[in-house]
Curated annotation (Swiss-Prot):
This protein's encoding gene: CYP75A4
Entry keywords, A to Z: Heme, Iron, Metal-binding, Monooxygenase, NADP, Oxidoreductase
Spans through the membrane: none
Organism encoding this protein: Gentiana triflora
Biological role stated in the UniProt entry: Catalyzes the 3'5'-hydroxylation of naringenin and eriodictyol to form 5,7,3,'4',5'-pentahydroxyflavanone and 3',5'-hydroxylation of dihydrokaempferol and dihydroquercetin to form dihydromyricetin.
Descriptive protein name: Flavonoid 3',5'-hydroxylase
Cofactor(s) the record lists: heme
Highest taxon in the source lineage: Eukaryota
Assigned protein family: Belongs to the cytochrome P450 family.
Amino acid sequence: MSPIYTTLTLHLATALFLFFHVQKLVHYLHGKATGHRCRRLPPGPTGWPILGALPLLGNMPHVTFANMAKKYGSVMYLKVGSHGLAIASTPDAAKAFLKTLDLNFSNRPPNAGATHLAYNAQDMVFAHYGPKWKLLRKLSNLHMLGGKALENWADVRKTELGYMLKAMFESSQNNEPVMISEMLTYAMANMLSQVILSRRVFNKKGAKSNEFKDMVVELMTSAGYFNIGDFIPSIGWMDLQGIEGGMKRLHKKFDVLLTRLLDDHKRTSQERKQKPDFLDFVIANGDNSDGERLNTDNIKALLLNLFTAGTDTSSSIIEWALAELLKNRTLLTRAQDEMDRVIGRDRRLLESDIPNLPYLQAICKETFRKHPSTPLNLPRNCIRGHVDVNGYYIPKGTRLNVNIWAIGRDPSVWGDNPNEFDPERFLYGRNAKIDPRGNHFELIPFGAGRRICAGTRMGILLVEYILGTLVHSFDWKLGFSEDELNMDETFGLALQKAVPLAAMVIPRLPLHVYAP
């Protein structure tokens, strides 16, 4: 061996020895200073080199994580690519992250969906927790999503639901099945556009409304994927799964639509001086005392949030609820009996009837439990130092997903039949007081804490009102036996039915009810 090689080897060995021990000393001193001398990460699977746990997730990550939690516990830690990922799978674990440590997990991690679909995270969903996000949230609550704002557009909901009933009645007269997801998307898009833009975006259900529905579903599906580039940024440019390319193409379609809507709206602003709509308020009040100002991308990104999340999440919940009722007809009959007693059969269900319909509310809660629209909630990021959760150490920069789907199937919360659709579980005892608005961590379909879904009130109202109206107004019939009804899921940001629901409807109220 040459002297040069021997010297080089000794130098390398010495450098490695010093580096290793200095690193240990730094970690020890930092731990002593911060109180984290015993840094015990939550348990979790080992994963693969470089890829970490990515290959373990499969097509249904929420189910995979739920199964992992049975082995590793309520809080898990996985290395996914170059990032740490914490998974909370029980109500107590969710509460620790989303309430006790809410501020520390108030940001979203960067991801391809935020970059390519949400105008580089300029929207209300993915924006950094700060003044601009607060301004978007404030305007949305004040003029569209808050309690008072919802009251102001109650007539819009009633009118658009009337159009939907008329279309379904016509389908029944023509002996045609109703495609539930298409009908719901069409109605909800027009409800929202009346409030946002003072006009219906679709004058009739057809190719354009179906294309919009397909775009919304594609967005919600692709935004929920575990994209390799998000977890291994160094190879993100390769787009190995083709996800980012699809996002870019979809964004162009949405941008054309949103730009046209925004330009048309600006041209007609004088017509609404006496009665401004939501978009007028946003444009006129798009700044705050902190000097934040909403630009065009912020406004288009906000519209994208409202139209996509506002139509897809609520419509998917209603579709799941109807599917469960058609699979369990005794539940459908019980719901109709309750409505006939409270409302009668001479008029439509009104929003004011809902507090007097506990079984309807229980059906909605049970659907939120079993089929949450966002099964893994939206990801969050640990932004302020290192934290302890349930005795475990969570490093700064760790990503967080709360497995809402797993919480809804926790036997310690829901008993021995968590996979059974049983609205009665919400009628009696402790569960009767559970509310899905983010304060009871057994049922958090909209999330909780600062980043809870801004449309929580609207989502609950739309689900209860529309589902109740459909159940009260029609009898329902499948073209096959209930046992053949497909109840498989398709994973995404929202949990879709793998096979869309189609059914025949039979009017059960007087003819005048079906006139808008």
